[in-house]
Amino acid sequence: MSTHFDVIVVGAGSMGMAAGYYLAKQGVKTLLVDSFDPPHTNGSHHGDTRIIRHAYGEGREYVPFALRAQELWYELEKETHHKIFTQTGVLVYGPKGGSAFVSETMEAANIHSLEHELFEGKQLTDRWAGVEVPDNYEAIFEPNSGVLFSENCIQAYRELAEAHGATVLTYTPVEDFEVTEDLVTIKTAKGSYTANKLVVSMGAWNSKLLSKLDVEIPLQPYRQVVGFFECDEAKYSNNAHYPAFMVEVENGIYYGFPSFGGSGLKIGYHSYGQQIDPDTINREFGAYPEDEANLRKFLEQYMPGANGELKKGAVCMYTKTPDEHFVIDLHPKYSNVAIAAGFSGHGFKFSSVVGETLAQLATTGKTEHDISIFSLNRDALKKEAVK
């Protein structure tokens, strides 16, 4: 195996694997290095499914990025035998006038002329029999959004990257970096590898390893859980046209997915999580009583027909920045190093376009996408890390 490459990608999860594909597709000699064997269950993006929304409650600035991501997912599905996307639509709702997230989602849809429908109170329960909400709730339904099959996405990118000549080095943690303006060296237990350019997308491990590149970003990894629950398939399944959803209630934001082929309704509590070290995280669902209790609390009140037996649970990670916006930028000192970090629990849907962006940054030092909101130099990153 060669030890010198045009570009080395450290961290071959969703973002890194996508970057590897877009690099290799251009004929760039690419090495992807990962501590595990992606797709795997040790990072941030397993658990079968992820939502892709276009009208974006985290900020209308994300909409063009989301739309490009969707285009790339469609392209990926045409190039692979894996199922990538299902257009379930996405329903976002919460108390009228009491949810900044719902309000921003509606504003984003209006500003960017995205197809959508609005509902209030009983209109919502009339449309979807499985939803129970107070009369003062409002909702926006975005029919063109839906669900991505996360492991399939990563697997497809890996297969295509390798088909285009990329090398994937698994079970190889990076121990150290040496960087100059025209050469990058990564050091591992299997040896050292060099490249002209480096892409760093290490997920939760960014919080531990970026300092070796003389980059300090206030990143905090969190333990996050999802559960799959027995449900009334006639109400809550994809076959019954039940949508993916995000709901803001008194104690935070919940998100979930319809049952696919009897999988059960999947639900997560976005506002939950323990601060962790990615090397010592407890990966057992139910290790904390709140793992299941928080999910049941929501189901009992808002989706009682899905409050059945727990079929399975999964543990993954969020890595948050103080403002919960991403970091996608070039190294402040070395323009041959591109960094992707801090996706704060809402990044997977963008991994296609993040991969494209990283490939552009690595090969040309710039990107066609507006990534100013993701700058390393923004004020929020100069403050203390998330507590």
Swiss-Prot record:
Residues with the S-8alpha-FAD cysteine modification: 316
Cytoplasm recorded as keyword: yes
Subcellular location: Cytoplasm
EC top class, as a word: oxidoreductase
Superkingdom of the source species: Bacteria
Single annotated GO MF: flavin adenine dinucleotide binding
EC number: 1.5.3.1
Cofactor (UniProt): FAD
Recorded GO CC terms: cytoplasm
Primary site of residence: cytoplasm
Keywords in alphabetical order: Cytoplasm, FAD, Flavoprotein, Oxidoreductase
Gene induction: By sarcosine.
Residues reported in the UniProt entry to bind FAD: 6-36
HAMAP family assigned to the protein according to its UniProt record, in alphabetical order: MSOX (MF_00516)
Subunit (UniProt): Monomer.
Family of this protein: Belongs to the MSOX/MTOX family. MSOX subfamily.
Function summary: Catalyzes the oxidative demethylation of sarcosine.
Name listed for the protein in its UniProt record: Monomeric sarcosine oxidase
Species of origin: Bacillus sp. (strain NS-129)
Lineage: Bacteria, Bacillati, Bacillota, Bacilli, Bacillales
Gene: soxA
